[in-house]
């Protein structure tokens, strides 16, 4: 939600939430293509890693259940402090699957995917295809790479019901554009003593 929220200028509405069933179909198609290219069986595996803030279980529960319902495994970890991020767990999972000999390719989606660069480079050096999916605005390190395939989430068919309103000060159209407020003006009244 953070990367998408930064693009939208606020919390995503239902129309702008990514559809994980579409991402799942895309992963299956990629695994099929990789199977065809290598002549071996490549089975897609999808895992999502998330932190759960104290008292936040009810907020993430519907999302986690929806992910599990479409075939994604979910690793959930309590967010107890700034150092309790899930990136080390993601890296450990990638390394474990590689050590088990079942990793035939890797697709990484992360708002902070640059944390995976060293592992990605090692896998690429071994000949494994690596794709990073995310948003161009937040993954310049992957977009600029000669060895990583980058796919913008909006380029995956069916992920978003509507095109994202990707307007920023860095990419203004010639005719100009309205930048929507991050919150309603009435939020200024919240917390005021009446």
Predicted regions and their residues:
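Nuclease catalytic cores that cleave nucleic-acid phosphodiester bonds
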Residues: 58-192
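Domain-level signal for Mg2+-assisted phosphodiester chemistry and nucleotide/NA-binding surfaces
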Residues: 1-84, 129
